[in-house]
Amino acid sequence: MSSAADSSAASGDVLVRRENGILIVTINRPAQRNAVNGAVSAGIARALDLLDRESELRVGVLHGAGTAFCAGMDLKAFAAGEQIRDPERGFAGLVERPPAKPLIAAVEGWALGGGFEIVLACDMVTAGKGARFGLPEVRRAVSRRRWRWSSS
């Protein structure tokens, strides 16, 4: 049994650990409902690069700390000019270029807007009894993404 922590975002916004061939990635901004800022996007991208690169890793699991999976984009960070998209992998370091190996979204609590996009970019979803999904931007006629319903 192997278990090791890997460094990710310097701020601790993304936590990464390995356990028995599984890369466990935690979005760690519970006070902000795990909203995606620049550090989260970069941290997830680095974690998924590690998943693709390391042969002993077979699968990734992505989840959120606290009571929400992910509330979507951090609008304060976006308004402050933070780069929310990773140049290689897109929004949240995942949406435009998911990893080659399977990625499971472990959802408990809310997955809203961009958080729901993250779920859709994963290969599999496991949802707890408290999982809730939504696209609140639709009510405001805001749609900035084209959904990919099939994987390549």
PLM region descriptions:
Residues 90-98, 106, 112-152:
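CoA-thioester-processing core
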Residues 38-39, 73, 117, 147:
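Generic recognition of short, well-ordered alpha-helical segments
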Residues 32, 64-99, 111, 139-141:
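Glycine- (often His-adjacent) and acidic-residue-rich active-site loop
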Residues 25, 62, 74, 118-120:
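Hydrophobic/aromatic residues within transmembrane alpha-helices
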Residues 1-65:
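Conserved CoA-thioester-binding segment of acyl-CoA-metabolizing enzymes
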